[in-house]
Amino acid sequence: MRVCWNLFLQLQGWTIRDEFPYHLKKCVIAVGPHTSAWDFVVGLAVRSNLRLYHLNFLGKAELFKGRFGFFFRKVGGFPVDRFSNNNVVDQVVEKFNASETFILALSPEGTRKKVDKLRTGFYHIAHAAGVPIVMFSFDYDHKTIYSLGA
């Protein structure tokens, strides 16, 4: 499968700059900007390319309903009800504490729409779990993915 994802990145013209800090067994990956549904597909390809098979992500609850719910869970997704105050931070911190290796990727914008400020959940999760934050940036103009690691 890794070969297919690498071929996808190559055919689409994407390059990955910098190295992922593989010494980290636990971290929060903040990915931005989140402007396209293609971010998810490119993210899956990057995950495979970097061999981050145990990477998890948060996604809006609507993605996990219906026929694609199984797929999103299978690739590491956890549904989040963005309009409910159900203490997602505590739930995710529990997952960090229960696992020897746990990497969580999410978009600080929380949406594909243009926003004036980032949501701070990624910071609160990392702080409460005592794990570093690794930044990833998708530069669509230059088809380059940057990792600004810990």
Please give the residue ranges for each predicted region.
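Soluble catalytic domains of membrane acyltransferases
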Residues: 11, 15-150
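N-terminal membrane-anchoring alpha-helices
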Residues: 1-15
